[in-house]
Curated annotation (Swiss-Prot):
Main location per the UniProt record: cytoplasm
Keyword Nucleus on entry: no
Protein name: tRNA (guanine-N(1)-)-methyltransferase
BP GO annotations: tRNA N1-guanine methylation
The organism of origin for this protein: Psychrobacter sp. (strain PRwf-1)
Amino acid sequence: MYFAVITILPEMFTAISEYGITGRAVQNKQVVIDCINPRDFTTDNYRRIDERPFGGGPGMVMMAEPLAKAIAYAKSQASLHGCITDSEHCPVVYLSPQGDKLDEAAVVSMRHYEAMILLCGRYEGIDERLLARYVDMEISIGDFVLTGGELPAMVLMDSVIRRLPDVMGDAKSAEQDSFVEGLLDCPHYTKPHDFEGLQVPEVLLSGHHANIATWRFMQQVERTKQRRPDLWQSFTPNAEQARLLKKVNKTMK
């Protein structure tokens, strides 16, 4: 998968391109990450990419022209990597608190793209005309404001990359994460058996795989009910999960 990140701070992205699971995916050529600086597409000596807003007001606004040129260049690079560059295969995504909320369903959908062009804003934002003409979707990572789109872009990339085939060392790790089945994750334990008087649940030491699976599922259920009742309300169990819920509810009566 090809990612082009349009940013005035390309150095930030070494955190995702050189370290951890995402860095290994880059090293193994499962993912390509290009950082494109819009300053490289300016025409003045100061490489200026922002100006005062029309109508007055605080701060600066990123100008449309250098960003449009950066997007065109990003699409040309995606094409060189063999990607189809229309919006269905290579969307231009603006990271914005006004966008649609990033969730696991969106991540699963995004992993099927051939490429993504991620537009990182700064200052007061980006000229609306650029967004109207060039951006296919706006994505938010939460109802809060950051100093720029770089961190949200890294969050999006990390979440998508780890869902790509063969990126995770153990595919089951991704399958058991929170939200993948519509539930939060279960608790996890490792050595020692006793930590400051707190014991590992006996069922995890039993070696009985069916009982362990049931315990973990029910922990997911209880944790989701307590911490994210909104998720629980929308959860639809599969046949096996429905059987377990019915069995547990019956034993509790």
